[in-house]
Amino acid sequence: LSHASQNYICHLKKKKRIDLKGWRIGLYHGSPADHKEFLFDNTSDVRFRELAIDVNADVVITGHSHTPYHKHIDGVHFINPGSVGRMFDGNPAASYALIKLSRHELVVQHYRVPYDVETVVAELQKQALPPIYVAMFRQGKKLN
């Protein structure tokens, strides 16, 4: 990444709230409770219920786990679009989500897009990063 890109990423807020078409949307890196907390599709519903109580949002969009999912728990939609580049679910294809909102309906569609992983691997090798990073990109898994 360029220094400008690194600087931009480092200065992003850890959370943000937006209101759109009558929906209260919270954007978080990790969870609403902790930006370092991993939320996965197999995280217990009990944990999602705990978060739903305090979040004051209709939609919670997270990242951090790099794992795509959509759960609707206690009136709150929990969505993770996945990751464009470094997946953790065993599929190296990039992942994103398209969220369609109307006043009374929310529809989430997840998409996977293959990309040339070997081009990324070549760049990683140029940077002399440990071999585990090459393995992670090729396997689409978190290995560290």
Feature map (PLM): residue ranges:
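Conserved catalytic scaffold of divalent metal-dependent phosphoesterases
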Residues: L1-V59
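Divalent metal-coordination and catalytic microenvironments
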Residues: I9, H29, H64, G82, ...
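Short, acidic/polar N-cap/turn motifs at the starts of alpha helices
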Residues: K13-R17, T67-P68, Y96
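Short secondary-structure capping/turn micro-motifs that flank functional sites
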Residues: I25, P68-Y69, G140
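Short active-site segment of divalent metal-dependent hydrolases/proteases
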Residues: P32, T67, G85
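Acidic, His/Gly-rich catalytic cores of divalent-metal-dependent hydrolytic chemistry
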Residues: V59, H72-N144
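Acidic, metal-binding active-site segment of PIN/NYN-like and related structure-specific nucleases
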Residues: V60-H66
